[in-house]
Structures are given as C-alpha cells and as structure tokens.
Amino acid sequence: MSGMLLESESDHEDSEISSGYSENGRLMSQDPLSLSTGNVMQSRLEQYSKRLSQLGLAATDGDSNGDGTDNDIIPSEYDEEEISVPKQEVPMTTSLILDKLPPTTNEFLHQLSIKEMEQDIEKTVHKIQIKFQPIGSIPLITPSVCTISSQQTFSMIILFLKKRLKVEQVFCYINNSFAPNPQQTIGSLWSQFKVNDELIVSYCGTVAFG
C-alpha cells in the first residue's frame, strides 16, 4: 500500500516538474517577441527625440514619462515681432527730461543757459566809436568821438546831434558820401564803412549832398 502511495507521489512530482519545464519553455519561447517589442518602442522613442531636436524643442523628463505639459516645451527663439519695441525720437531739450533731473542740476543748467545768453549778447552787442565831423558853419561838438551800442539805429545819432547842437534839424552823412536810412543799425553801417575801427559821421545844418 505504501509502495503505491510513493509511486503516486513520485508521479505527481514528475508531472509538476514536467509542467514547470513546459511553462518555462513557453515563457522562453515568448521572450524573443517581448524583446522585439521593447526594441521597437525604444527605436520609436529615439526617433521621437530626434524629431524634437530637429524642431528646436527640448524634451523634458515629463515627455518621456508621457505626462508632460505644454509649459515644458520652450521655443529655441522668440518671435521678433512679439518682442519688438517701437522707436520714437525724443529731442534732448524736452522739459520732461529736465523735470526728472535733481534740483541742483536744474539750477546749474539754468545758470549756464543764462551765462551763455549773456556771452552771446556781448558778442553781438558791443560799443562802436563814432567820429563826428562838421560841414560848413555848424559848430563842432566836443568830444568829437563818442560811443554807441551797435544795436541802436542811426536815428539815435541824429537825435543826439540835435540835442547837443540845440537845433531842430540836422543832416548827417557817412564818410561825406551818402545819407543813411535812419532805421539802419549802427553795427551794420560800422561793419561796412568803418575807417580805423571808427564810423565817420559828417553833419551840417543844410543839405550838403544831392
């Protein structure tokens, strides 16, 4: 009886071993297919990665795990139209720039501009020497050389002579040649007809020329 039990147990063990071999054989027969499938997936992932690199996109770890988001994809360069800044020319003398300067700087610029204006005025406005020469019997004024601003008109010289000579009428000429327009500036006449840096003005009580 015991011999029969031993044989049956042995047969059961043999059947389990044989079934294990068959199962292992079946799994081994399936391994090449699984390996082939893994190779295909790996190849596809490599192709996908190459395409991403060609498009200039960076694949993150989230993409490889399949749970990446659109925020993980960063363009390699931005659109120039989106980041372009409109250009506008602004003059340097605008008051907006001056208002943003410190008070001390504004005061310095103000004083500098006043000084420059005074220098320009000194360059354009200067004293001119007038030498008076009487014609005929009209009295000689003393001193015969006077100074006057270059911005004054010739009418001021006529008025000056009338007051000094105490006459109602006087006729004036430049270099004994012509009578200038009373509205002409002294500086203009001096620059054109000066003699030894003096403007020679002849005067008389009656019409002397023409």
Curated annotation (Swiss-Prot):
It is a peripheral membrane protein. One of its GO terms (cellular component) is phagophore assembly site membrane. Residues 60-72 have a biased composition (Low complexity). Residues 1-41, 58-84 are annotated as: Disordered. It is found in: Preautophagosomal structure membrane. GO terms for biological process: autophagosome assembly; autophagosome maturation; autophagy of mitochondrion; cytoplasm to vacuole targeting by the Cvt pathway; glycophagy; piecemeal microautophagy of the nucleus. Ubiquitin-like protein involved in cytoplasm to vacuole transport (Cvt), autophagy vesicles formation, mitophagy, and nucleophagy. Conjugation with ATG5 through a ubiquitin-like conjugating system involving also ATG7 as an E1-like activating enzyme and ATG10 as an E2-like conjugating enzyme, is essential for its function. The ATG12-ATG5 conjugate functions as an E3-like enzyme which is required for lipidation of ATG8 and ATG8 association to the vesicle membranes. Forms a conjugate with ATG5. This is Ubiquitin-like protein ATG12.
